[in-house]
């Protein structure tokens, strides 16, 4: 912040950035002289604020969606792996809808617990070093893995060279920097609603 007139708008922008897309911290640097109690500050701000260079990216390329659907429908040993991003984006209903449509087994990370009902017979329990044997073995042996809102934490992956060694991996995430950051994936969809990928899976894939 370089002047007191921009304080209110800067804080508004910071809250927008912190709470949209992938939520996270925002640093605001306030010079000491602006904290002087004798300095009068107007905290009115514009209702509509445009943030230069900040835009949540989405990828709604129909060809990429169709390709992901083909990979999913060709699976012999599929697995769905959901993380905290599903909770943060309030996409649990979409996740349940897609999982039921595909009739595939599903596991959650610790941060993703609650995104899918634990009482359902398709749920294999939590994944990772503190997870269930069934979930970990199903992940290791799967031939297609759909990762949704997950960051491939080391408590889940363990040795990255041995993680899902036979699987084609599809990663859906709102943050482009998370794609292939830890685990190299075969197919990615950025910021895509699960509704988009569920529609092609309803149709016969030849």
Per-region residue spans from a language model:
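Glycine-rich beta-alpha junction loops
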Residues: 30-36, 84-86, 176
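Short gly/pro/ser/thr-enriched loop/turn and capping motifs at secondary-structure boundaries
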Residues: 35, 112-117, 153-154, 176-181, ...
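Anionic-ligand anchoring segments at beta-strand to alpha-helix junctions in alpha/beta enzyme folds, i.e.
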Residues: 60, 73-142
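Structural signature of the thiamine diphosphate
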Residues: 1-45, 68-71, 136-170
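Short acidic-hydrophobic, aromatic-tinged amphipathic segments that line or gate anion-handling sites
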Residues: 1-3, 126-128, 187-192
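Short internal beta-strands
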Residues: 29, 104-110, 170-173
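Gly-rich Lys/Arg/Thr-decorated short loops/hinges at beta-loop-alpha junctions or inter-strand turns
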Residues: 41-53, 115-119
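Single conserved hydrophobic/aromatic residue that forms the stacking wall/gate
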Residues: 195-199, 203-206
């Amino acid at each position: 912040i370089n002047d007191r007139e921009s304080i209110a708008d800067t804080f508004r922008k910071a809250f927008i950035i912190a709470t949209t897309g992938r939520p996270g911290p925002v640093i605001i640097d306030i010079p000491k002289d602006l904290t002087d109690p004798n300095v009068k500050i107007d905290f009115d701000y514009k209702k509509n604020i445009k943030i230069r260079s900040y835009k949540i990216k989405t990828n709604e390329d129909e060809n990429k969606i169709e390709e992901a659907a083909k990979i999913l429908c060709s699976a012999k040993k599929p697995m769905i792996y959901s993380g905290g991003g599903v909770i943060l984006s309030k996409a649990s209903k979409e996740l349940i809808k897609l999982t039921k449509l595909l009739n595939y087994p599903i596991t959650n990370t610790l941060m993703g617990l609650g995104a899918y009902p634990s009482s359902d017979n398709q749920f294999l329990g939590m994944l990772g070093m503190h997870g269930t044997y069934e979930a970990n073995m199903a992940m290791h042996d799967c031939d297609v893995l759909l990762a949704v809102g997950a960051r491939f934490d080391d408590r889940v992956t363990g040795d990255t060279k041995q993680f899902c060694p036979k699987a084609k991996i599809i990663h859906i995430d709102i943050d482009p920097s998370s794609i292939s950051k830890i685990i190299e994936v075969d197919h990615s969809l950025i910021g895509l609603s699960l509704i988009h990928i569920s529609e092609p899976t309803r149709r016969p894939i030849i």
